[in-house]
Curated annotation (Swiss-Prot):
GO terms for biological process: DNA strand elongation involved in DNA replication. It comes from Mycoplasmopsis pulmonis (strain UAB CTIP). One of its GO terms (molecular function) is DNA-directed DNA polymerase activity. It holds the Pfam family DNA_pol3_beta_3. GO terms for cellular component: cytoplasm; DNA polymerase III complex. InterPro entries: DNA_clamp_sf, DNA_polIII_beta, DNA_polIII_beta_C, DNA_polIII_beta_cen, DNA_polIII_beta_N. The gene is dnaN. Belongs to the beta sliding clamp family. It is found in: Cytoplasm. Keywords: Cytoplasm, DNA replication, DNA-binding, DNA-directed DNA polymerase, Nucleotidyltransferase, Transferase. Forms a ring-shaped head-to-tail homodimer around DNA which binds and tethers DNA polymerases and other proteins to the DNA. The DNA replisome complex has a single clamp-loading complex (3 tau and 1 each of delta, delta', psi and chi subunits) which binds 3 Pol III cores (1 core on the leading strand and 2 on the lagging strand) each with a beta sliding clamp dimer. Additional proteins in the replisome are other copies of gamma, psi and chi, Ssb, DNA helicase and RNA primase. The keyword Nuclease does not apply. This is Beta sliding clamp.
Amino acid sequence: MKLFLEKSRFLRFLENTTKIIESNNSNYELRGAYFQVRQDKIILISSNEDISIKNEYLLDGIKNKTEGESDFLVLNSLLKNIIKKCSDSIILEKEKNTLKIFSDLQSYEINLLDHERFPDIKFGLNNSQLQLKTEQFKQALKNVVFAADLSNAQELLLNSVNLSLKNNILTLVATNRARIAMQKIKTEDSQEFNLTINSKVVKELISLSMSNTLILSPGTFELKIKSGNLEIKTKVIEIPYMNVENVFPNKFNFVIHIDKKELLSLIDKVSIVNDEKNGNKILIEYNPSKKEKKLKLSSYWPDLGFSEVFSDNFEVESEILLKFFINANYLKESINVFDGMISIFITENKDRMVISSETNLNNKQLIAALRGH
């Protein structure tokens, strides 16, 4: 079998399909890229056990063509590094258990892995299918995944994103208990499903290049996705997700309206004197009894020092005293899903903050208060 390929197009295809491969995977075969070469296309499959990808590279019979058909499994990291060194035109030639690569005055030879030991992954969509705009879905994932506890390998639900479809609304949720991020997408689909996927898988989904639309196809033990020639299969977490809708309060006694850029600037300035060990803690204060009514953010760390910043570029709906300790990183990540003016709602007992904005009415963020100094 001999393949003739355009480097730039093939490299884009290879990198997009194999970016999920883990070079240190304990299953050695999963370090490989599995090629199935046919007369009109190349089928490429990759997997890291949690997520698997199948993609097709169409052969035009001119600059991209094959002489013969074959299946082979090649160490992905080695193949990719070689392709990057090649010039514009590449020839891949399989002979028995080796793959030879030629490009102008360069030549390489790689020993192949045993493709028969590569897992038999069943792609193809399930009966349940939901069509979405790809960018809308990926943005929704971005708007919630940061709230998951990526370092928590013990409590799977806190290191995951939940997707549920009910009453024509697809709801995406992530939480680490100290905060919740929720995004909703309106659909025209009346079916129902509820599934949870690991946050690492979510980040891998976001990174993939896809066509303009995609199909979500939930199953009992997996979520399948199809976008153009790209097919994805991911594992789901088989533990019921907690209901977080009722955690969001609906009664508040303090509301701040402030521009996102203004608040981000304040957080960046005050966080210079801060530390991860201190929980990146800052204090938000408002005192209506003072002559000059300003919003104050301050940070104190015994071994580092003290900082405070003020703003008069804001509005409040309640002339009451406010003191609210919060994780600065959580606040920054939450407001970054919005643009322009944001609204911050604080409960009467000052234990929770809810953030929303007219710029993204389908998203809301909740952050629990930290204890004071």
